[in-house]
A protein has these predicted regions:
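Conserved, function-defining micro-sites of small-solute handling proteins
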Residues: 1-102
Length: 102
């Protein structure tokens, strides 16, 4: 598991930190994007509806059955900041490793 914690449905599999590689973390994220200039009220409504859908037990169970943990962001801005920080973090890693597109 490359996340910071074990996934409940795969509890026997240790995290990378538990397996001897502390500091390594990577989590896949699924989110929606909207065109630049989308009104904040529209973004807020989308966030509200998605958060509500992810709280429905049957929907949550479908995600969990695929080893995915629904974790809606606090707000559209929070998700955008998270994604920007991941681009910066992973970009630095790619540059440090000298990885080039082929």
């Amino acid at each position: 598991m490359t996340s910071g914690e074990r996934v409940p449905m795969l509890a026997a599999i240790p995290t990378t930190a538990e397996a001897g590689t502390p500091g390594f973390r990577f989590s896949a994220r699924i989110g929606l994007a909207a065109p630049a200039g989308t009104p904040p009220a529209v973004m807020a409504r989308l966030h509200q509806e998605i958060t509500a859908a992810l709280a429905v037990p049957e929907v949550r169970t479908q995600f969990l059955n695929q080893a995915m943990i629904p974790a809606p962001s606090e707000s559209p801005d929070a998700f955008q900041k998270l994604m920007q920080s991941e681009v910066e973090r992973l970009g630095a890693l790619i540059r440090a490793a000298g990885i080039q597109p082929e």
